[in-house]
């Protein structure tokens, strides 16, 4: 059984992993399914029975986020990617703004449920599933007053 502090670290590692994948996708146009699938599965798991059900084996499934988080808060400060740190902080700020919008939270929940049907039909990382989530983002979160500015290769950013 993990305590609340460990749960918070794991949740933060998931945010850092998402930010890291955004940076990697913007720079290279590709991300690892091993790193992205656990995050997508967590999005679609809207009724977990316990905390472990959200991310499974966090040491394996969130290793990218845990390693980067360790770089950020570790004493050495080596290998800190400023873009990943900026995206992480931006995601946390966006979450704070979203938490005040009950209407948008409900819309997101319904949209995630709809996108989960795409994931069941195709696969969790299939382009149709990702497109459904991207459309959901465009119709909800992108309308908040705060926007995350992603930098990278213009070719990949257009997609």
Residue ranges and their predicted role:
Residues 1-75:
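Leu/Val/Ala/Ile-rich N-terminal alpha-helices, chiefly Sec-type signal peptides and the beginnings
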Residues 3-6, 82, 139:
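Residue-level signal for the start and early helices of compact helical domains
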Residues 41-134:
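Long amphipathic alpha-helical segments with strong coiled-coil/leucine-zipper propensity
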Residues 109-112, 137-148:
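Extended amphipathic alpha-helical scaffold segments
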Residues 150-153:
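Aromatic/basic-lined ligand-recognition segments
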Residues 156-159:
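Alpha-helical oligomerization segments
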């Amino acid at each position: 059984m993990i305590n609340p502090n460990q749960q918070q670290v794991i949740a933060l590692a998931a945010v850092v992993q998402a930010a890291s994948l955004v940076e990697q996708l913007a720079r290279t146009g590709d991300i690892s399914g091993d790193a992205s699938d656990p995050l997508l599965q967590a999005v679609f798991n809207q009724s977990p029975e316990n905390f472990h059900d959200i991310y499974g084996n966090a040491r394996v499934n969130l290793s990218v986020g845990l390693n980067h988080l360790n770089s950020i808060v570790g004493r050495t400060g080596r290998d800190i990617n400023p873009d990943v740190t900026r995206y992480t902080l931006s995601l946390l700020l966006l979450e704070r703004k979203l938490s005040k919008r009950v209407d948008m939270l409900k819309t997101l929940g319904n949209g995630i449920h709809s996108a989960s049907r795409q994931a069941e039909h195709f696969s969790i990382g299939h382009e149709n599933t990702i497109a459904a989530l991207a459309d959901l983002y465009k119709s909800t979160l992108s309308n908040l007053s705060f926007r995350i500015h992603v930098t990278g290769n213009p070719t990949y950013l257009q997609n």
